[in-house]
Amino acid sequence: GNALQVLSQNGAEPNAFTSNATTAYYFDCTEHFEENLKILLSFVSVPYFTQESVDKERGIIGQEIRMVEDTPDWRVYTNLLECLYHSSPARVAIAGTVESIAEITPETLYACHKAFYDPANMMLCVVGDVKPDEIAAIAEEILPESRGEVIERDYGQEDMRVVEKCRREAMEVSMPQFLVGFKCPPAADGAALMRQDIIADIACDILLGDSSPLYQRLYDKGLINGSFGGGFDQLPGIAYLYAGGDSNEPETVVRAILDEA
């Protein structure tokens, strides 16, 4: 049966998510941990797709895509990435489009599973009162012994130019929503990546945090509300700093951010 249903019947709380860089399957439980871990590892290791299951999931995902496309905060975020990046996969919607998922077949999914669902491309993370040696033994027992080739990824060439300076989209909202983004040179792996992340987070707090002079000035003038904030994201091959929220005068707020920076 469905692995997530089996995990639920076994007392676990399973779920899954896909981001721009990762697909993850996980569960929480207070008992039967080893058994649940074996179920999860078997689930991701042994693919099984039929035309019926693909058609069913296509309908569900299509509904989710339509719902997300009607969400203002998601639209402003995806528009930001499309404006910032020329070729990075980050500019492509994670769930795809209704048209693109219509082309998916069981063969497509088997090919993707073979390419990406390989132990060489996986990470297993366990948090709790467990013994690492026992976890490693379970993983070695369940996961395939053979290791595929390390996948060479091509995220395209990105320079510091943006695709579009500004994009507007009309939607039914009580107050305009906006985001402004700044492309940053991506750091290398390891310590450089962590250092960039820490420095950028500190910079965001100093410049955009709710105790910053900029935030207080804009708030006192009624130009922003509690939704205003900023952050820093790193994805494979790219990095960017962003700020935004709700405002009746987004252009004024953006100019103030640029002046402060």
Which residues does each predicted region cover?
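Charge-rich, well-structured scaffold segments of protease-associated domains
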Residues: N2-E152, R168, M175, C184, ...
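A domain-level signal for the structural core that forms small-molecule/cofactor-binding pockets
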Residues: V180
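Short proline/glycine- and acidic-rich turn/helix-capping motifs at secondary-structure junctions
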Residues: D154-V163
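Short amphipathic
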Residues: V162-A170
